[in-house]
Amino acid sequence: MGKMNESKKIIFVDNLTSINEIENFSNQSNVKIISFDYTSHIKLTEKNIEHEISEIYLTQDTKKLQKQCYEFLNWHDLDIIKKNTSFLNVNISRLCNDQLIHKIIKILKNFSEIKVVVKQFPNLEYFASGDLLLISKLWIKSINEIPNSQKMKFYFDNIEIGINIGKKNIKISIPNSLYKKIKNIIEKVLESILQNENLSKKNTLLVEFNTKKFKKFFLESKNYNKNIAYYGRRRPGIWDLESFKIIKNSQCKIITSNIMKGDILKTYKKNILEIKEKYLELLNSNKELNRFFSIDDISIISVISPIIKLLIIDRLEEIIFEILLAKQMFEGVHIDSVVVLSEIGMTEQIIIQLANQKKIPILHLQ
């Protein structure tokens, strides 16, 4: 902390900040660098760049931060959101909480830390990028921008796949778009092998289950004369020989995107455009939303808005497709009950909201 008092410049760094830019500052004696996450801390350490970690400025109780985070996650319950950004009575803003929660926690933590730093050292020159720049602008009138080295990513942008080679398990990361293409091809092949039947009979829908982890649950369903159908948009029902045998022996039906009839998205292009415009209008100028996303009477909507734009608005076609697919599934498959493991994922939320509309009972298995 002693060197901080001698510094004239403070640089905020996170995992998106260009470390090459930071190297230009590192040899200056009047500069203090603060890392705001583990990834940037490791990168700076590998480059032998002296820095502090932001946690030493975290004075707020983490439980309070978590409480604030969960309050912000309820933004989808605002009447103005439900009224203007729903599709087929599905609350779109509620579908992305599993991704949004990580971003909001990080924003709240960084907000608390930056607040302490700026109040402690008010007259220094500050440098930041990305979210750190937007948060800093809430406290600092003039701040210098550092370029980001990469774009913001979300948890499900990449999918990690484990491949067994001999006795070794090698994990590779692939884009979600590529994963879905591979998954669709495999499911088409498996669909022809398994030949889904009896979808017109009553089925219990299992949503995003791990087939091998719930092997007993799948296999014993036959003993209760109960038809089961699997619906997984993130997780495949079959990915190796063991999971294939479980699905086959349990006579479980795999429901895939092949139930979608034609390019149905074209029918809803106008709806999609209208919802996008409503989101942008609300994020840019709605006073109620400004007040809702506030900490100590300071609105952080300027920090939250870019995340919502990337997470929801830019992916709206994909989200609408998932809603339409689930709707068509309920229309084409006789579902009399639904079982979920979680209520926070997008697939689970879509199924829960549509099932509630149809008064289909939902069991949350823990």
Q: Whereabouts are the PLM-identified features?
A:
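Catalytic-core helical/loop segments in enzymes performing group transfer/polymerization on anionic/lipid-linked
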Residues: 1-366
